[in-house]
């Protein structure tokens, strides 16, 4: 599976750049579980991002055990950028994510697992522009 392509203007310090970074992060998230390659995901994740660290660790552990996830279809909609509030270090980007069923092959002789599709799951990203690129400082799944 080829690595996701970086969107044009992704590194610009604009609302469009921040939104493009979120799209790219979500593509890298899927790519990490499919291939075990977390290099680009790590490069755009701040150290304090628990969601990012968990994703990197889980994808790495899955692949170290000989497992992988099949590619799944995902749709990202309603991406909204919010200017950072005075006194805060991060801008906010909100996105609705829907995905088809995910099939995981854990490896080590463990049976294949599937997860249910989701529809319009709301994700809240804390992003900031640092050293010429957008970094992900945190991701929260909103309870609906």
What feature does the model see in each segment?
Residues 14, 35-39, 55, 60, ...:
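Residue-identity detector for threonine
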